[in-house]
Amino acid sequence: MKKIFTILAAAALAVSALNAQELTNFAFGGRGPRIVSPEVKDGKVTFRLNANYATRVQLSGNWMANPWTGVEEMKKGEGGIWEITIDAPEPEIYTYNFIVDGVSVNDPLNDKVQRDGSRYLNMLFIPGERSENYYEANQHGSVTTRWYDSPSLGYSRRMTVYTPYGYEKNPKAKYPVLYLLHGGGGDEEAWTSMGRAAQILDNLIEKGLAKPMIVVMPNGNPNQKAANTLGIPAEQMDRQDPKWQNAYVTSLVKEIVPFIDKEYRTIAKADGRAIAGLSMGGGHTTSATILFPGVFNYICPLSCGIRESEDLDNQLLGIKKAGYKLYWIGVGKEDTMAYQGSLVLDKHLTDLGMPHTLYVSEDAHVWKNWRLYLNTFAQLLFK
């Protein structure tokens, strides 16, 4: 029996080694030198791609002057290795890919990938003070996906929920809740993927800079049951139909909030609830707090333009009468989609004597800003 066990163990090790060899062959083409990409060293970043067949390889990254169309040419070296070295951009998380003979491809040597809607892009981490909370903390919270019934929309839907470190070990403790909403093209996975929400909250809580809190990240597309990656067909929806105008916002307040209060140990009152959202989610944030004043005492619309309207003052006065603790607006000065609209909201709040903060950052309508905003306003919640 001992001899048989030894043989089986040896066979298992052999299979493991073969699998590792297969992965090695896949990553490095099974030929030529082992290469590293990206390589961050001494203030420089080097990108490499083994593509001997290619006639032209370019690098595209969102740190470039034009993040949408900007490219830099890579040079072909010995063994068909294409390479480029650039000055490291400022500390942040960036995305990039290669363009090989006109076709966009990901870096096969970099398994750090994030999804932006239907696009999958490689991630480049540049360490530093600004990005330190985007890395893993020592104490980790938990991220789970939950399904809930939505009678108003007519089907079950999925959300992502973050619970802080220690939630499971402290069965009597109750926690405040941040409802964190994504933008257009996103879904319930956007804030944990591109937004690094779990890492940011883990770090802030571990450092004592933020209160331990639950974070709820729903799917803000009322025609979707869940992210498209699950392969669940979206429902047909006429966006011009008035019944859909505030369908998601109503579901958020009337269905999601009660579900969370029932399923989790929450501080189930306005002082224990915050709502924040980027772009489309910022619109959901303003709509939810105008239509349902007194549900959330911490309000943070991000990169969200609001239009002038004759009724805007009356709508905002409902929030003032209900009371609130924090109204925090974040926008980038280069955000052509939301900057002017944020100034409109700022002016109306000022004219109505409603205390608030207008936080204006650099850059435009980008995740670089939204991670910064979460890292900033999360420190102000529930205090």
Q: Predicted regions: what is each one?
A:
Residues 2, 30-33:
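Short, intrinsically disordered low-complexity segments
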Residues 21-28, 35-69, 75-383:
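Non-catalytic cap/lid and distal C-terminal segments of serine-dependent acyl enzymes
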Residues 1-23:
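Bacterial Sec-dependent N-terminal signal peptides
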